[in-house]
Each structure stands twice: as C-alpha cells, then as structure tokens.
Amino acid sequence: MNQQWTQYIQIIKQVVKPALGCTEPIAAAYAAAVARKELGTSDIDAIEVRVSDNLFKNSMGVFVPGTGKIGLKIAASVGALAGDPTAELEVLARINEQDVAAAQQLIDEERVTVARMDTQEFIYCSVTLTSGDDVVSVTISGGHTNIIQIMRNGDVIFDAPPQQRVATASVCEGVDISIKQIYEFATQAPFEEIKFILQAAELNTLLAQEGIDRGYGLEIGRTLKGNIEQGLLGNDLMSRIQMMTSAASDARMGGATLPAMSNFGSGNQGIAATMPVVVAAEVFQNDEEQLARALIMSHLGAIYIKSYYPPLSAFCGNTVTSAAASMALVYLAGGTFEQSCYAIQNVISDSSGMVCDGAKSSCAMKVCTSSTTAVRSYLMAMGNHSVKNQGIVGEEVEQTIRNVGSMVRFGMPYTDKSIIDIMSA
C-alpha cells in the first residue's frame, strides 16, 4: 500500500476513536484523572477547573455518563476520584454509584470550582487538584486528550513540544488529500487494511439500539419509531436513518454508559458519519466490504472537510459530516464519483446555516436534520441534480469546501461570542 494511503489510515485512527460521553466534559474528567494519578491520592481537598469559552459552551447542558448529572463540576470531580487515566475518552467507563456520590459531596461542600479562561485555543482545559500541601495541575489544549503540561507543586514535570501544543491545526496539514483522493482510497485500498472502521458500525449501532430501548433526552428516536409503527411514517430509508441516528444521539447526550465511535472529537459527528451508512447498507443489501469502504469514505471525508476550520466553532459540524455521509450513500447505491460530489454540494447548500449552541439533548435533532439532508441530497445526486455557483456553493466541490472554511474562520467568531454570551446570561 502506498505511503499516501498509509497517511490516510493514520489520520482516521488518530481522530476516529471510541468516546464515552460528550467529549468536552470528558476532557475535564480525563485531565482530573491524570492529575490524581500524579498526585498519588484520592484524598482531594479542592478541584479547580479552567476552560475555554467553547469547551464551556459544550459542557453546559450535557449529561456526564454514569452520573445522571450535567456539567463540568461532576465530570471533573468524578474523574478525579475514580476516572481511569489510561482510558482517555473512556475515562469514566468504570465509575459506580459510590464514586458519583463521593464526587457530588465534593461539589456540595463547594470544593469544586469552574471558571472560563481567555485563550485563543478552542479546546482548552486545565484541572488543578489540591491535597494538603500538594498541588498538581494538568493542562489539555488543542485536542480533548492532548496533554501539553503537567505541574506538581510549581515544578513542570511534563511539557509537550511546540508541535504538539497546537493540535487544532489541521490533521491534514502537509498531507496530499482531496475528495477525489479520498474516494479512490476508500474504493481501492485493500479491505484488510481498512476493515478496522467496521468497529464504528458496531459501537454506534449498539448506541442507537440503546436509544431505542430506553428513554434518553428528547427521545427523538423512540418517537419516530412509535410513529413508524402507527403508520404515520413509512418504514423506509429516510425514516429508518432518522430514527437510528437520532436514537444514538439521544443515548449519547442523555448519559448512556456506552461509547460512541467519535469523529474529530465529536460523538454526534461520529454517529452522523456512521449510522446513515449502516442503515443504507442494510436497505441496499451491501456486503461487509462495501460497508467498510463507505464508512472510510464518510469518516475521512468528514475529517477532511472539517480540517478547513477550527473545532468547537459556531458552525455545527454535523452539516459537513452529513455531506461526507451523503457521498458514501451514493457509493453504496452504485453511483459515480461525480454524483458523490453532487451529494456533498447539495448538503452544504441545504444545511450550512446550522449553528452550534452547545452540547445538549437537542443535538439529536440536529443530527437527525443533517442526516435527513444527506438522504435527500443523495437522491438528488443520483438523478444528476446538483447545486453549483449558488451562495457559498462553488463551481466544484473543493471550492465549496474552501468556502465553508472561510465562512467559519472569518465570518463566525462574533456569532460564536454572541451564542456564548446568551448561554451564559
């Protein structure tokens, strides 16, 4: 296999990972768990959490898995007391009711504080634990598990090199990559080299089934299932994709103790990249190899498009993730590369106005909306209908992707500030 394709696999493995719970509060839990390990004790007097505005925004309304509670305080406190520092985004996989009760006691005793910090980094979290005379601080920046510094009693015991400190820089930087190259890689790479991506289908399908079986969040998936059973909605491709994507997000945002396969640090975007493809493969009766190729196309396509703008911006990343999923739907349906590009153009034209106003249960509605757009856009593409040279959509797909990046980087910082101010009022 050529070096370029090896790079693509490395990128996917770097940012498509299992994650238990919304990744923003989980970043605080992870930092706290690492700090406790360095501290050498769970006898903690105080916990101080400092985060970027964007990480704060995405932690305000989402349940922390295994706790039944919302926010950074419970995430940091239970992470500090019982989190597994070796498990990264699955740091809270083994907590129990006693751990949660002890963490809540720290909060009730006002020993846990959270503050916003003025920083240029979108993903930033610093957790400081105090036990007697000992103080340990762990700082994460540029990625949800990207530790850049550890301090103990004022001494720096770990300091990341400069190239590791700005991980929000594109993971695709310096890599020869485009939508066409992604398509060729996904359709031509040896199956044995890419079949690892099938774990995304396994994990996110289990999460969707959990959302169907139990009541989480707004219960969008369960609501759609009930209406299908009553005959108010058809049991067709569109409805099944809507049901399964929203059910997975319901469970994800509602604190289910099952991991999602995330994409670029987002569980919901991992769901949006996975579940439409899984459902379509079932409907079209594609085989396992075709499913794997479509998932590679969807996940890597989403990573590539999102590499043009910073994470945790005011732009809802489910839009462009669903654009990549729509591209994969065309492949599963036997369409051409040109039609796959049409699908991306159509999705971006349709739903690029969707903003991110924090992680919360209603994110499942946005996942459902963007996935619906993916299906409609694939259907249009198969009929050779494509938006071009309208609004931010350019003549061809690469221009459109660059336009999205420009819109987010230069046009949406004030929108982001306004959203955070409204949420914090």
UniProtKB/Swiss-Prot annotation:
Give the molecular function GO annotations: L-cysteine desulfhydrase activity
Q: Mind listing the GO biological process terms from this record?
A: L-cysteine catabolic process to pyruvate
Question: Which Pfam families does the protein's record reference?
Answer: SDH_alpha
- In this entry, which stretches build a coiled coil? none
Mind telling me which InterPro entries this protein's record contains? Ser_deHydtase-like_asu, UPF0597
Q: Which domain of life is it from?
A: Bacteria
Q: Which family does it belong to?
A: Belongs to the UPF0597 family.
Q: Kindly give the HAMAP family that the UniProt entry links to this protein.
A: UPF0597
Please identify the protein, giving its name as recorded. Answer: UPF0597 protein VP2173
* Naturally occurring in which organism (per UniProt): Vibrio parahaemolyticus serotype O3:K6 (strain RIMD 2210633)
